[in-house]
Design a protein with these regions (language model features):
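N-terminal lobe/hinge region of extracytoplasmic solute-binding protein
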Residues: 56-114
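Gly/Pro-rich hinge or "lid" segments in bacterial periplasmic/extracellular proteins
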Residues: 92-93, 206-298, 302, 312, ...
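Aromatic- and charge-enriched surface segment that lines or borders ligand/interaction sites
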Residues: 105-160, 185, 191-193, 316, ...
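Extracellular/periplasmic solute-recognition and catalytic clefts
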Residues: 153-157, 163-164, 272-287, 304-366, ...
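Surface-exposed binding/hinge segments that line
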Residues: 157-245
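Bilobed periplasmic-binding protein-like "clamshell/Venus-flytrap" ligand-binding domains
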Residues: 199, 203-205, 389-392, 440-490, ...
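Append "and occasionally in soluble cytosolic enzymes with long acidic Gly/Pro-rich linkers
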Residues: 282-284, 371-506
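Detector for C-terminal structural segments
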Residues: 381-416, 497-505, 533-663
Length: 663
């Protein structure tokens, strides 16, 4: 339920804005560094502007506005945040979860004799969707309930709510059509019960974080939710149904995901137009919105989200093709922005530490990247310090594990990490030693590999249970070539630099390795990660290496289930590295214990397990962290009150912004 209800951690895959970090460390507090600005003189007071902002975003919209239930692209998630903001608990400017008094009247936790815990939640009366329909407890129960049905499995929901909620597992499997752990108490009160195994949770208060969805909008006319005393169930025209895929409900749901108009939601803005062909989305103020957790309502009437192109973004800003360009990370682009400001453009630059890092991600279920020695070797064949200096030009720093420099855990562990993490510094000899130790000692004929003159290295995988695509048969043996398939996204400067400094570098060739680059679009990247085509059909694993970025949308650090070997959860998108480290002290064990074996508030115990987890991760290296960075956002000087930081993105910051000169 934690991941479904609160979406505590979002894997943010950034395309061309996947870049680098700052040489300065962030704040020692969990809250992010406050954005700093460089401004040109204000525009003339007589200048009039339309009450509209055009936002340029480098991440392509896919049209999945489900808040991460299907996919979790950065731009799609941003749109969802703009149109859905009635969670009972939400993140504040520091990335910490807080109660949302606009929505939440009261809540309580009851610890039950069987070890489970029940959260009783009462919402305020008078809340409505953007179409004026009232919001009740049923709407909150429905969203939680939906992820516990066979329907969620059929559509490959990323939610694991069925694992956390009492009775969710048997409903998910289709044994029953109700969830005993989701109850409707009265019109504005519901309860959610968490199973004993997960009731003990370091971030336990977030179990009270639920949000509303309109039943008929998502499933179709006549659908609803009811509770006769045993738990909630889905209804159609008043009759109980077992909600499965492959029917009108699925058709309606898929159409609703990116509805071009009539998108029923409950946030500061409403979608008024979405054009998938141009990846452009227009939103206008929702007049029914009651305000965020601080009661703040937006004043800027219209937001238009457009695709920012790497080659033309500066011209787009100059000519009015876009007003705000968020998340600039390329060192050249940052310097271009600062030069534009110095030259008198009506812009201000907001800088803030990134809560995330750019990376190479390995898929450890196919090809050579299944083997840890290969992952180590790739890391040592890339000069990351030079990469960061070249790409970031002083705005980035190298990190050695999954953390951001602004995190409290990192700040409290600097000495420990320096003493215990391997940096995988550029070292061709060390890389070759790793490969030899890992058994990559043969040629394509089975002879001993001695140098690059022999071509690619090969490994005897005859007796190993591995994915053997691309292998050759020699004298009854199965030999795997040291050829890594790499998928990268188009118009991506990070990919361009990796091609030069890694894939096409002489050091790689001299080591008997080949990295084959395939360039494609965002949907192709998602297919490569989740082993699914655009229609959700499973496809064979093909790529062993990708480049993207990871970001945290809150100060919560929870990787539980990210290393699971449960095939149902893997099918939902968990463990997207396909690395199954299941023994005691492994990634799965440590990530689970970090949050489920620690009492809320026991930071020292949490930190100890966090450090163990980071060390184990660094040993197995499922990814190569490239950089932690400072983001820059370009904002017009005629926009006031726009403040952005690590955990406070455009969707949140725009609520506090205004255009005093708006007509």
């Amino acid at each position: 339920m934690k991941k479904f209800l609160a979406l505590l951690l979002v894997l943010t895959m950034v395309l061309s804005m996947a870049a680098c970090g700052n040489n300065e460390t962030g704040s020692t507090e969990p809250s992010a560094t406050t954005g700093t600005t460089e401004e040109t003189p204000a525009t003339e007071a007589t200048e009039v502007h339309e009450n509209k902002i055009i936002l340029g975003d480098t991440t392509e919209l896919t049209g999945d506005f489900t808040g991460g239930l299907i996919t979790n692209g950065a731009s799609d998630m941003m749109i969802d945040s703009l149109v859905n903001d009635y969670g009972t608990m939400v993140t504040n400017q520091g990335g910490n979860y807080v109660e949302n008094p606009t929505v939440l009247k009261e809540w309580s936790r009851t610890d039950n004799e069987d070890g489970s815990a029940t959260y009783t939640i009462t919402i305020n009366e008078g809340l409505t969707y953007n179409n004026g329909e009232p919001i009740t407890a049923k709407d909150y129960a429905f969203k939680a309930m939906l992820s516990c049905t066979p329907f969620a499995s059929a559509l490959s929901f990323t939610s694991a709510a069925y694992s956390y909620i009492v009775g969710g597992d048997v409903c998910y499997s289709g044994e029953v059509n109700y969830v005993s752990g989701i109850r409707l108490i009265d019109e504005y009160t519901l309860s959610v019960s968490v199973v004993a195994d997960y009731a003990q949770y370091y971030y336990a208060d977030t179990y009270a974080a639920v949000s509303p969805w309109n039943e008929e909008f998502w499933l179709g006319e006549g659908y609803g939710i009811a509770d006769d005393g045993e738990g909630c169930y889905i209804t159609l025209n008043g009759e109980a149904v077992t909600l499965e895929g492959g029917n009108d409900a699925e058709t309606n749901f898929r159409a609703a995901m990116s509805a071009t108009n009539g998108f029923v939601s409950a946030g500061p803005y409403s979608i008024t137009k979405y054009d998938p062909a141009t990846s452009q989305c227009t939103l206008d103020i929702n007049p029914y919105y009651a305000g965020n957790f601080e009661g703040q309502k937006p004043s800027i009437q219209t937001i238009v989200v457009v695709r920012a192109e790497d080659a033309t973004w500066a011209d787009q800003l100059k000519t009015g093709g876009m007003d705000i360009y968020a998340g600039i990370t390329d060192g050249d682009d940052i310097n271009t922005l600062l030069d534009m400001i110095d030259a008198g453009e009506d812009l201000q630059a907001i800088a803030y530490d990134r809560a995330g890092y750019g990376k190479i991600q390995f898929l450890c279920d196919v090809g050579p990247t299944q083997f840890v020695e290969v992952r180590h070797a790739v890391a040592q064949l890339l000069n990351r310090e030079e990469f960061v200096n070249t790409f970031c030009q002083g705005f980035g720093t190298v990190v050695d594990a999954p953390y951001a420099t602004a995190m409290q855990m990192y700040q409290d562990s600097k000495d420990f990490l320096a003493d215990n993490l391997k940096s995988y510094a550029y070292d061709v000899d060390a890389a070759n030693a790793e490969l030899t130790e890992g058994g990559w000692t043969l040629t394509s004929t089975g002879a001993e590999w001695t140098s690059a003159d022999d071509g690619l290295r090969y490994k005897d995988v005859t007796d190993l249970d591995v994915n053997t695509d691309g292998c050759v048969e020699v004298d009854g043996k199965t030999l795997m070539p040291l050829q890594i398939q790499w998928y990268s996204t188009e118009s991506n400067p990070v990919s361009d630099l990796l091609a030069i400094m890694l894939a096409n570098a002489d050091a790689v060739k001299q080591s008997g390795m080949e990295i084959v680059q395939t360039v494609g679009d965002w949907d192709g990247l998602l297919s490569a990660i989740y082993h699914e085509d655009s229609d959700g059909n499973k496809i064979p694993a093909e790529y062993g290496m990708l480049n993207m970025a990871t970001g945290w949308t809150s100060a919560i650090y929870d990787y539980s289930f990210n290393w699971t070997d449960d095939p149902d959860k893997v099918a939902l998108g968990y463990n997207s590295n396909y690395l199954f480290d299941m023994e005691e002290g492994g990634l799965d064990d440590l990530s689970m214990r970090m949050v489920y074996d620690v009492e809320p508030g026991d930071y020292d115990a949490y930190l100890d397990l966090w450090q163990q987890y980071i060390v184990r991760w660094n040993e197995l290296l499922p990814e190569i962290p490239l950089y932690c960075n400072v983001y820059y956002t370009a904002v017009p000087t005629w926009v006031e009150g726009y403040e952005q930081n690590s955990y406070w993105d455009f969707a949140h910051a725009i609520l506090y912004a205004s255009i005093p000169s708006a007509q």
